[in-house]
Regions:
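Sensory-domain boundary/capping and coupling elements
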Residues: 7, 11, 130-148
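PAS-family sensory domains
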Residues: 115-125
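Sensory modules in modular signal-transduction proteins
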Residues: 6-35, 39-41, 84, 145
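PAS/LOV-family and closely related PAS-like sensory domains
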Residues: 39, 48, 60-102, 110-112, ...
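Alpha-helical sensory/transduction surfaces in regulatory modules that relay environmental signals to outputs
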Residues: 43, 50-52, 59
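Sensory-domain boundary capping and coupling elements
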Residues: 104-106, 123
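Adenine-nucleotide cofactor-binding loop residues
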Residues: 57, 110, 127
């Protein structure tokens, strides 16, 4: 039997979810977390037991919640995200209470009949990269000559 034949397709999606280093989160149409893989635990610090059944507010900073839910609800009504708005770097919350930056990709999930089921997100911790880019921008600003101010 070949290796390909020995892979049980029905278990493959579970193996992929468990093995991927990125966070994979699925929330239903009410914004309740229904799937939280081990990568999500690594990125956000919450276990699946702490997350499943909770609102996405668990990982959304309070000041960003209105914008998040406005976008979430519009995507449900529209039947998907707008082109070009499927990926972004945004702030999120870690279990420690510390803000983190995540590089997040979104998709609305539909069943084969086209019925909207909820949304999924794949996220990577981008905090170190964001801080490094911020430091590089600051250094560049310090090295860039400023226009001379006219004497008064």
């Amino acid at each position: 039997m070949s290796t390909t034949e020995s892979i049980k397709v029905e278990n493959l999606s579970e193996d992929i979810l468990r093995s991927m280093p990125e966070a994979l989160i699925f929330a239903d149409l009410d914004g309740i977390i229904r799937l939280w893989n081990p990568g999500a635990e690594t990125v956000f610090g919450f276990t699946a037991a702490e997350s499943i059944g909770q609102s996405l507010d668990l990982i959304i900073p309070e000041r960003m919640r209105k914008a998040h839910w406005d976008g979430f609800n519009k995507a449900i009504v529209r039947g998907g995200t707008l082109p070009g708005r499927t990926s972004m770097i945004t702030r999120s919350l870690h279990k420690s209470g510390e803000p983190i930056y995540v590089d997040m990709s979104f998709a609305m999930v539909k069943n084969p009949a086209g019925q909207m089921l909820g949304s999924m997100a794949v996220a990577r911790d981008a905090t170190a990269r964001f801080q490094e880019e911020k430091n590089l921008r600051r250094q560049l600003a310090e090295l860039t000559p400023k226009p001379e101010q006219p004497e008064q």
